[in-house]
Amino acid sequence: MTNILSPEKSDNDQELPIRPSYLQEFVGQQQIKENLSVFIKAAKSRNQHLDHTLFYGPPGLGKTTLAKIISNEIGGNFKSTSGPAILKAADLAAILTNLEKNDVLFIDEIHRLNTAVEEILYPAMEDFELDIIIGEGPAARSVKITLPKFTLIGATTRLGLLSNPLRDRFGIPMRLNFYNTEELKKVLNRASKLFDIDLTDSGSEEIAKRSRGTPRIALRLLRRIRDFAAVDGKSRVDKEISDFGLKRLEVDLIGLDSNDYRYLKFIADHYNGGPVGIETIAAALSEERDALEETIEPYLIQIGLLQRTPRGRVITIAAFEHLKMPIPNQSHHQFNIFNENE
């Protein structure tokens, strides 16, 4: 699923080096920043590595950025890979044996590691040792390699898919939450200076409140609205040009786009608001289940338009009102069922 409001990374998101380098520059996630600052200072005061850290939550909220910040704060090298890229245990062994003391190894989509690779990680995380097999058949022997004290940082949008043994080995688990409008305005104002964009306060607010609580989306929208302003001969990005650009991009007043409307209208039109299973929705919309669960549903749930119930997805009365559709008679019964299961 590719669209302007997708929180997933895209090549176009890397236009300028706008990532903050240190905790004091990072906007939002205040509790996480404060706790990380304490943990990092404590580790440095003891001359120890930082405990292995797990960032989880919706995409686009700063998990990779925070991992790089930790690397800068503790003064180690930053090594990055992803779960799908590590196909064999030997691939991970090669990465681990090239680490140095205080290095940060960042594994994105860590929930997609296969079992054989995970088993290599367990002793590496707990004891900083790597057990490898040399040779084949009767001549094969196990060799134990001591690893330097490093920090593993995992990132996942699907915490429930992480195995319990792996999850339990992270000493610092942290959930990243959606941003509010004021926090996104700060992100946009900082970026506007780096992009050399004359962004007014009203323009910043208009973009922020329609960015789905996600910095990555806010920055992407800012770049596109800058394009509309330039072509229209505008020297600044204000509320008027922001609203114009967002309408052209089919982003409505609460940050929904055509994909969200397709999703909501399918449930409303064909299932009277639900409940309906996610597999049915995915098949009907010709989308992957993972794409719906990671890209569309989190924000709809966050703003109260969608509920996940034991019987399936149910859109709320607020969703019907936003769609300007009549509310089916049985809707109140669906929501009562949901509330009873809470």
UniProtKB/Swiss-Prot annotation:
Region ranges (Small ATPAse domain (RuvB-S)): 180-250
Domain of life: Bacteria
Region (Head domain (RuvB-H)), start-end ranges: 253-342
UniProt-annotated binding residues for DNA: 289, 308, 313
Class of enzymatic activity (EC top level): hydrolase
Protein keywords: ATP-binding, Cytoplasm, DNA damage, DNA recombination, DNA repair, DNA-binding, Hydrolase, Nucleotide-binding
SUPFAM superfamilies: P-loop containing nucleoside triphosphate hydrolases, Winged helix' DNA-binding domain
Main location: cytoplasm
Compartments (UniProt record): Cytoplasm
Start and end residues of each stretch annotated as Large ATPase domain (RuvB-L): 1-179
Documented EC number(s): 3.6.4.-
GO biological process: DNA recombination; DNA repair
Gene Ontology terms, MF aspect: ATP binding; ATP hydrolysis activity; four-way junction DNA binding; four-way junction helicase activity
Annotated residues for binding of ATP: 18-19, 60, 63-65, 126-128, 169, 179, 216
Recorded GO CC terms: cytoplasm; Holliday junction resolvase complex
SMART domains, sorted: AAA
CDD domains reported for this sequence: AAA
Binding site for Mg(2+): 64
Signal peptide: none
Entry similarity comment: Belongs to the RuvB family.
Subunit structure as annotated in this protein's UniProt entry: Homohexamer. Forms an RuvA(8)-RuvB(12)-Holliday junction (HJ) complex. HJ DNA is sandwiched between 2 RuvA tetramers; dsDNA enters through RuvA and exits via RuvB. An RuvB hexamer assembles on each DNA strand where it exits the tetramer. Each RuvB hexamer is contacted by two RuvA subunits (via domain III) on 2 adjacent RuvB subunits; this complex drives branch migration. In the full resolvosome a probable DNA-RuvA(4)-RuvB(12)-RuvC(2) complex forms which resolves the HJ.
Entry remark concerning the domains of this protein: Has 3 domains, the large (RuvB-L) and small ATPase (RuvB-S) domains and the C-terminal head (RuvB-H) domain. The head domain binds DNA, while the ATPase domains jointly bind ATP, ADP or are empty depending on the state of the subunit in the translocation cycle. During a single DNA translocation step the structure of each domain remains the same, but their relative positions change.
Protein name, entry field: Holliday junction branch migration complex subunit RuvB
Source organism per UniProt: Rickettsia akari (strain Hartford)
